[in-house]
Amino acid sequence: MLLDVTLIVLCAGNSTRFEHKTKKQWIRIENEPLWLNVTKRLASFSQFDKIIVASHEDELAYMKNFTDDFTFVKGGDTRQKSILNCLEFVTTKYVMISDVARACIPQSVIKNLLDEKENADCIVPVLNVTDTVIYETNTINRDEVKLI
């Protein structure tokens, strides 16, 4: 059963904070580029009506060689512009957006978000922090910090 949900995966960035000569989306996981691995993994979690991948303009044609299962859209020069470009191709009532760098999202998080989709205008996952958190020189109580 389709859920009236479009999945958008953002991978149009230049990976400037990544500080590596290869863009994040092209790092390999199990012999696949990260963007393909993450998108296929997320797609396997639910029956999305459509899956849209935002790509850098220079990489669009190459990405299309990997699969016909997704709609590829030219990303913008900011995350917000990439989202806007993708939204032009959405025909469903609901949209789920993920960044390609979120390769390890548990299926339970996706399921919980989809289960709650009709209960709010916008839903984001709020995850507990398990690492030590330091702000300036002070260790912060990790129970007071959340990952979004």
Where are these regions (language model features)?
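Conserved beta-strand scaffold positions in the cores of enzyme catalytic domains, especially
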Residues: 26, 72, 122-123
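Conserved N-terminal catalytic core of the sugar/cofactor nucleotidyltransferase
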Residues: 34-92
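N-terminal glycine-rich phosphate-binding loop and ensuing alpha1 helix
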Residues: 2-57
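Acidic metal-phosphate-binding loop of nucleotide-sugar-dependent transferases
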Residues: 79, 100-104
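Short amphipathic alpha-helical segments
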Residues: 20-23, 40, 64-66, 108-110
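Residue-level signal for inorganic ion chemistry
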Residues: 9, 35, 86, 98-99, ...
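Short aromatic/hydrophobic "clamp" motif used to bind/position activated sugar donors
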Residues: 95
